Amino acid sequence: LSDVALGVGVQRSNQDFKNRRKQTRDIMRSYGDDKDYSLGGHSLGGSHALNNMSQSKSIRDRVKSVHIFNPGYTLPFHNSIKVNKETKKELDKKINIHRVKGDIVSAHANKETAFGNVFEYKADKDADLLDKHTLDNFTNTEL
């Protein structure tokens, strides 16, 4: 249901998104404000991070950086997480959206994002749709 909620831009009322935001705030409060917090996620996890940053000032104030990978990002989701100009300016400094060209889950992120910086990577030319979405695109490296 969370995937559907973000697909149509109603994740604010989705219990999974609400729970994730509360859990994130609770974890940060338990460790204190003197820590350097960062958020990360892939696919739905990346969408959770974007939603948390747009919806919670207490999370936003504590987080120093965000790196997300092929987040679920649709036009309705985009419209639902828009923030005011001042907040956008703050989030543009913290949020980095990494996506593979041709990934359909993060497809709208190549057009525009509500905030943050987009880094786009090329997939192997023989990659199928699942290959383009996998986190392996960002973790497989030659040693």
Each model region followed by its residue ranges:
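Gly/Ala-rich beta-loop-alpha elbow adjacent to hydrolase catalytic centers
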Residues: 41-45, 49
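Short glycine-enriched nucleophile-adjacent loop
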Residues: 48-57
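Compositionally biased, intrinsically disordered low-complexity regions
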Residues: 9, 34, 42-43, 74, ...
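A conserved cap/lid and substrate-binding interface adjacent to the catalytic center
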Residues: 1-39, 56, 60-65, 80
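The feature captures the conserved acid-bearing segment of alpha/beta-hydrolase catalytic domains
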Residues: 60-143
